[in-house]
Amino acid sequence: MDTVLAVFAHPDDAELTCFGTLGLLKSRGYRVLVGIITDGLAGLDPARATDRVLEAQLASAVMGFELLRGALPDGDLQYSSQLIVPIEKWIRDYQPAIVITHDYDPAGIDHQDHIAVARAVLNVAHRKPGIELLLQVEPSRGSRSFEPNVFVEVGAFAANKLAAIACHKSQAHKDYLQPGYISLRSDWWAAVSGTSSPLAADGKIHVEAFRIARSLIFGSSALTFTKRPDRVEESSANLLRLPHPRPRTVA
């Protein structure tokens, strides 16, 4: 069984940005691992220290994913061997074919922990030949520097994604975890990508956006990439169609 590993700084990062895509991959036979580097406790009442761990466990359970936990301090991640080592261990131990992580934004627009994790994952992943697809997600609050070049329609998994996000009750006050905000993001990427075939029970189009950091042709891909007509480059022997660095749709 092929494995997909999602590596993120905090509990709720993956839920917000790629749980629909992870659900799609699981439905097509992938083992899905969600790795959280920090304890996520910054700004949280110490008396509720166990809440974030439990919330992450519940969220992954909603989707049937396996949860991996790191123990580095929330809010103080630095690009260093201390961060690289646990990520390298996960990749060595689980040998993922697909890795998903934060977008690396050198301008520092995103959360500093996200930037550090993204840089560390890129460092490790580009040294591991077994990783055939490396995707970076949209920053939680959006960023003008984020230019996705692939989109995934995740309507079939939208309800479970929202249920997983709702597990993070300690973070319920944050605007970017509100259903309306999540829907607005999805609507925007649906418009940008030209997606027009709703798959969700609510009749809406639900889209997640990614930037491809690494892509190799491989026959076992669970994602079929459909590009705009003027940018198509297909491999007839593979489900994965390699995209050029320009927006297109994943069906």
Task: Outline where the language-model segments fall.
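Short, well-ordered secondary-structure micro-motifs
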Residues: D45-A47, Y79-S81, D110-Q112, F146-N149
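Active-site rim/loop-helix segments in enzyme catalytic domains that contact anionic ligands
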Residues: M1-A97, H126-R127, I217-V250
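Active-site adenylate/phosphate-handling loop in enzymes that bind or generate adenylated species
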Residues: W90-L133
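The feature marks non-catalytic terminal segments
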Residues: D2, I131-L133, V137-A251
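Active-site environment of divalent metal-dependent phosphoester hydrolases
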Residues: A14, G40-L44, G75, Y104-D110, ...
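Internal, well-ordered alpha-helical segments in soluble enzyme and binding-protein domains
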Residues: R52, L83, D113-V121, F157, ...
